[in-house]
């Protein structure tokens, strides 16, 4: 199963080793052993083989990248479909949007709201009474 992916690399490495062996400054064989090998590749054949291997490698990589992009697109569309299923009931989506807005308003409004601020409600009520009494001309206590 892993051999199918590594076969272009194996052929490429064999080609490189053959080329490196022929380019050595001091040959390892004697002059008598340098008879032409019928299985050896000519320079043109080696270049064609190398070009074919590179082309196959590039094609395989582009196919892998396309498959990854398709998988990402299907994952994105599945997220959108799950959100659409959740928001199929319009009141649920509207309620959650209003809930977020309400929480943001109370969080950033500066008014105390909720169980975290038990004393501020009285302070706000007292300040409102003082403001209303000043508008209507009612005298306030000097406390």
Swiss-Prot record:
Organism (species): Ovis aries
Keyword Secreted appears in the UniProt entry: yes
GO molecular function, one term: hormone activity
Modified residues (Phosphoserine): 42
Entry protein name: Calcitonin
Domain of life: Eukaryota
Signal peptide: 1-25
Residue ranges with Acidic residues bias: 65-78
Compositionally biased residues, Basic and acidic residues: 118-133
Localization in the cell: Secreted
Major site of localization recorded for this protein: secreted
Any one GO cellular component localisation term in the record: extracellular space
Modified residues (Proline amide): 118
Keyword ATP-binding: no
Keyword list, A-Z: Amidation, Cleavage on pair of basic residues, Disulfide bond, Hormone, Phosphoprotein, Secreted, Signal
Bridged cysteine pairs (disulfide): 87-93
Its job: Calcitonin is a peptide hormone that causes a rapid but short-lived drop in the level of calcium and phosphate in blood by promoting the incorporation of those ions in the bones. Calcitonin function is mediated by the calcitonin receptor/CALCR and the CALCR-RAMP2 (AMYR2) receptor complex.
Annotated Pfam families: Calc_CGRP_IAPP (PF00214)
Region span, Disordered: 62-86, 112-143
BP GO annotations: adenylate cyclase-activating G protein-coupled receptor signaling pathway; regulation of cytosolic calcium ion concentration
Pro-sequence residue ranges: 26-84, 122-143
Family: Belongs to the calcitonin family.
